[in-house]
A protein has these predicted regions:
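Catalytic-site neighborhoods of secreted/periplasmic enzymes
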Residues: 1-108
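Catalytic-adjacent loop/helix segments of enzymes that bind and process anionic phosphate/sulfate esters
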Residues: 7-13, 110-137
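Stable alpha-helical elements in mature extracytoplasmic
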Residues: 22, 122, 153, 166-169, ...
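Loop/turn elements at helix/coil->beta-strand transitions in domains of secreted/extracellular proteins
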Residues: 24-27, 133-140, 188-195
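Non-transmembrane alpha-helical segments in soluble domains
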Residues: 27-30, 41, 127-131, 181, ...
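Active-site His/acidic residue clusters
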Residues: 40, 45-48, 126-168
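The substrate-binding groove and active-site-proximal loops of carbohydrate-active enzymes
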Residues: 104-120, 159-172
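Metal-dependent active-site segment of extracytoplasmic phospho-/sulfohydrolases and closely related
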Residues: 172-195
Length: 195
């Protein structure tokens, strides 16, 4: 969805978010609001933030002027001891799940994703979609968040590549594609599917 109109950051994540995939022909969408390294760290399904509590609205700001003051959540710049990885290249905003992000965020606590569970989450959603739609032709756009920064593979993949977090995230991505392939096989869809 980007950073808002002309980079203004003006998207109200507490309302129906549009335009999005549903406005360009997708019957169903389950996406990230932006890249994994930016706020807000929430999933959006059919234009609505998943698990958003209306009593804890989301506020996003990419233009917080005082970089040394926290904006809602602690920041990587001011609170490096709270991070699980060193920040770099502007990734020093709000800390969520130990990861310093680009941008600043307040609210939306119940809607926050778990970085280490993202591959499983998107895989499960995709498998669910395949099984629910297997009796008719469908188009599934399965876009992997790995190996984009912050590269947070699930612990079961940590150290598997011998090449650090990026290599481990690639191993996780490869596993995810394999699981999707197995689903197409088990649902007897593989012979009638373009991958």
């Amino acid at each position: 969805l980007g950073d808002g109109v002309a980079g203004s950051g003006i998207i109200d994540y507490n309302l129906n978010i549009s335009p999005g995939p549903n406005q360009v022909g997708f019957d169903f969408s389950h996406i990230m609001a932006d890249t994994q390294d930016r706020v807000p760290t929430v999933y959006i399904e059919n234009g609505k933030v998943v698990n958003l509590d209306p009593n804890d609205p989301i506020e996003v700001n990419f233009f917080h002027q005082n970089k040394h003051d926290d904006y809602g959540l602690p920041t990587g710049l001011k609170n490096p001891e709270m991070t699980t990885m060193k920040w770099h290249h502007g990734h020093n905003g709000s800390i969520i799940n130990g990861v310093p992000r680009i941008g600043y965020m307040k609210g939306g606590k119940n809607a926050l994703w778990s970085d280490i569970d993202m591959a499983d989450h998107f895989l499960d959603k995709s498998i669910e979609y395949i099984k629910a739609n297997k009796s008719r032709p469908f188009f599934l756009f399965y876009s992997l968040q790995q190996p984009h920064v912050p590269r947070t593979p699930h612990p079961r993949f940590e150290g598997q590549s011998g090449m650090g977090p990026r290599g481990d995230a690639i191993i996780e991505a490869d596993w995810s594609i394999g699981e999707l392939y197995k689903t197409l096989q088990s649902e007897d869809l593989l012979d009638n599917t373009f991958i």
